[in-house]
């Protein structure tokens, strides 16, 4: 950890260098995901491509960005589904994607062939996701009307459902005890999405497109239903 003179000027203190010094592994495996997220909402993020790929540690991207336009919930939902599409790290395009553009690589992230170490990307959307969520605060409404958009399994092939802060019960599909990590349940949302997702992985370029149509319709319908 970097320790500075407490009497020194504030501008000499670098929070990121003190608490998270950049190296290839942390940037390519962590910062790159933030870069991909920023890239969906802000302009000029492509100038930090070399940093996100771990090639230029000195050209650090900003800690936060100003979105080009007001960010709506659906934009955030979809940013959670990113696999670096349209970038040099696009996981649908390299040899690991196979014949059906599968944007997933099984762990570990790095592997060795003939003495050369190679790297698999770690995208925003990953196959090992247990659950994911987006919190929506609406300050003009009572606190009880806040919404937690909640989903299970892979974000790219599952949908988000609005759950109000005032909710007093849990539906059976999300309830504790309805299935487990090792026990399949046909009424568990996790297991149903997990099953669908695993089918999609076999013919990803074809099946995921159909899943996305249903996902978009559901989320857009729900967004209209919760408008205030």
Each model region followed by its residue ranges:
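Conserved small/polar residues in nucleotide/adenosyl-binding loops
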Residues: 1-6
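Core active-site phosphate/anionic-ligand binding loop and the adjoining beta-turn-alpha structural block
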Residues: 8-13, 19-21
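Accessory, solvent-exposed terminal regions and/or long lumenal/extracellular loops of proteins
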Residues: 20, 27-29, 33-116, 122-124, ...
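Substrate-recognition/cap regions that form aromatic- and gly/pro-loop-enriched pockets
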Residues: 97, 101-227
